[in-house]
Amino acid sequence: MRMTPPKDEDGPRVTIITPSLNQAPYLEETIRSVATQDYPNLEYWIIDGGSTDGSLDIIRRWADRFPFIRWLSERDNGQSEAINKGFRLSSGEIVAWLNSDDTYAAGAVRRAAEFLAAHPDCMLAYSDAVIVDDWGAPIEIYPHTQKIFNYRRLASVSDYIAQPSTFIRKKVLDEVGMLDEGLHWCMDWDLWIRIADKHPVLYFPSLTARLRDYAQTKTRMGGRRRWMEIVSVARKHSGQRFPPAYFIYGLESTATRLNLDRSVRSRIKRMFLFKIIKLCIDRHLDVFPDGWVTQKIEFSFYNAPARFILKGVWPLENVPVLMDVVLNGHRIRTFRFEAAGMFTVTVELPAELLAAGRNALLVRSSRLFRYSRHDRRRLSFRLIDHAFEGGAAPATGGNIP
């Protein structure tokens, strides 16, 4: 099919890939959300696995209307193979995949392309997504997204990146590889970790996608096999025999099975399990969505900046606190605060402690407090902003509002 020649002013070409198999009830809405994007240099590949439910009629109708929509239909060995096929066929500098029951928000592709243009070192950008029900009605904003990227937490605790909100520079796939076709549930999580091990991964503030959640999703139907795959990925990347993900997703799998039983006892057990899951996840949080930090917060960064700048608020008057700054396991500074209010600290980063690739900088507080009787979180300070400056300044995580 003929492709519209790109113009220099159109920005880098973005290729969207949709893998699909017998998803006719949702497919048209997915295609419409891509076809109506306001980004001019767009390529769209629909990789169909041999559908027999009318999906091909929907695809043909849209492909006839929009010359940037291309498609093929043939049997494959699952979602990962279909997406990889799309990666190989794509001509875009930026690639993403959108499953055939998810949709993009208006302007999503343009905002992602603009963000990546402003952050040339970033190889994977992610944002927010809203969870919708079977009918497309919003349920909630995806609650696990972390605005400050943390490699350790991604590799060992949970996948906090909403897949349809992600956009990838295609060239990084030549370095780290495409999706592992042996994985059926965690292929995206595994790819995020492999990219983040070598290059900056950044959050950008935007509501980019709608993530559909209903009883027949592959995630819901995965059961124990999905849990075992999660455990294998977490073990591989964290080096831990029993990483936190082992327990968090094990409890989640049990709660999902209980969901099939509508008895009062099962509902009570399910509610109890989800409370435990939330406690487990919160225990490993660095920073809450409102900017409050737990006992420690870790920043992942790359290259070799000269200094780190941290801005925050210490809330307690006449209560002294010590804050250690630890670079790649070495404590390099300790700060003491005694008065409540805003603070700004600047830390010079010793060049001899910086790694060539991924680095970790930890800020650890000596005191915790509870904000009120109604807020039982154990907190240290509120993060306002952070930055790495000087040297080969790296891309780093986004600000906290």
Label every PLM stretch briefly:
Residues 40, 48-57, 99:
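A conserved acidic beta->alpha catalytic loop
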Residues 107-139:
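Conserved donor NDP-sugar-binding/catalytic core segment of glycosyltransferases
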Residues 41-50, 70-75:
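Short beta-strand/loop segment that forms part of the nucleotide-sugar
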Residues 54, 81, 102-115, 133, ...:
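Acidic donor-binding/catalytic loop of UDP-sugar-dependent glycosyltransferases
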Residues 16-17, 141-233:
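Conserved nucleotide-sugar donor-binding catalytic segment
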Residues 74-90:
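Glycine-rich, basic loop-to-helix element that forms the pyrophosphate-binding segment
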